[in-house]
UniProtKB/Swiss-Prot annotation:
Catalyzed reaction equations: cytidine(967) in 16S rRNA + S-adenosyl-L-methionine = 5-methylcytidine(967) in 16S rRNA + S-adenosyl-L-homocysteine + H(+)
Protein name: Ribosomal RNA small subunit methyltransferase B
GO biological process: regulation of DNA-templated transcription; rRNA base methylation
Compartments reported by the entry: Cytoplasm
Keyword Cytoplasm: yes
A cellular component annotation (GO) from this entry: cytosol
Gene (name only): rsmB
NCBIfam families according to UniProt: PRK10901.1, PRK14902.1, rsmB
Broadest EC class assigned to this enzyme: transferase
Keywords noted in UniProt: Cytoplasm, Methyltransferase, RNA-binding, rRNA processing, S-adenosyl-L-methionine, Transferase
Transmembrane segments: none
GO molecular function: RNA binding; rRNA (cytosine-C5-)-methyltransferase activity
Organism of origin: Salmonella paratyphi A (strain AKU_12601)
Amino acid sequence: MKKQNNLRSLAAQAVEQVVEQGQSLSNVLPPLQQKVADKDKALLQELCFGVLRTLSQLEWLINKLMSRPMTGKQRTVHYLIMVGFYQLLYTRVPPHAALAETVEGAVSIKRPQLKGLINGVLRQFQRQQETLLNEFATSDARFLHPGWLVKRLQNAYPTQWQRIIEANNQRPPMWLRVNRTHHTRDGWLGLLEDAGMKGYPHPDYPDAVRLETPAPVHALPGFAEGWVTVQDASAQGCAVFLAPQNGEHILDLCAAPGGKTTHILEVAPEADVLAVDIDEQRLSRVYDNLKRLGMKATVKQGDGRYPAQWCGEQQFDRILLDAPCSATGVIRRHPDIKWLRRDRDIAELAQLQAEILDTVWPRLKPGGTLVYATCSVLPEENRDQIKTFLQRTPDAALSETGTPDQPGQQNLPGGEEGDGFFYAKLIKK
């Protein structure tokens, strides 16, 4: 492999782009993975996800072991040292290989003169590891979350906040959705067993299966044929609450990448579905999902605040609004969220959600159902949002999910369960 494609330096560059430039890892990582051999792609992903999951610990260690921060053109070295710490702490990479490859990464980023510095810091960490980790265990950084988010979780969940944080810091389970138009869930579980894998059904979501051990999609029976889709169990709750029926006109708003659009069509293959998203690039994923599953829907680019631009005066029997949110319920899947979000974002998102709710509600037919969903765990985006919507919307009534005082159903992330998710089912009187 070429020297400039040193895995550790690529991981350092990816993390730097996320933390310093505010880019999402899902945008940064794929082009970098094209630069490495197939056998190394999984390790590159592990290093990027792992460093972002434990970023506050790695930052704390650097501050302890270095007298001044790396700045300017040397900044990538700061993240390269983090990659070194992460390997020594959390991976099975032999320490001598972790050190050698990380030090060599300095050459790839054209900072060969800093090889000695990197080597010295990593070796100092090895010598002081036990003392440093004992001290870290009592520091504020031990939660591996930004302080503002810890405070919000403490306020919202006085008895559960630590469990939420622990769940966010874990590796997520792999959940699948069995396409009921091809197989029953039990039938597909039998095929999975025949393929030498084991899965477990979810008690509440009838299409959801958790793999005992995550696996590449090409190993899953019938993935290419559309028999199964990768989708978290909690995300599958949207179609369960929406309960789409054949022949209905259904709006899936904020639809990309299309997991919920295709789930609606699996439940109601004869439904007339309009899938809308503001992000034209992400809409290509909706088309890809529809194509793999052999389904048809109308797909449009549009802003949820201006429905006249993409649906004229149409009204719908059912609307799924998977609202733009902080994504604080899916941190274990997307650890970069912790460092991309800011405290001020929450009020701005809540305002945007309220605007979309108010403008899309008139597009629901009388007697129709709207499911408001987010992958957030923050009440400002969830229960508080729906409570104030019900107060200002006299023809809206809550159904199945919670009470007027505590509207909606809040799933919290945890262990082998689904991600953090919120649903409120509303009926138009």
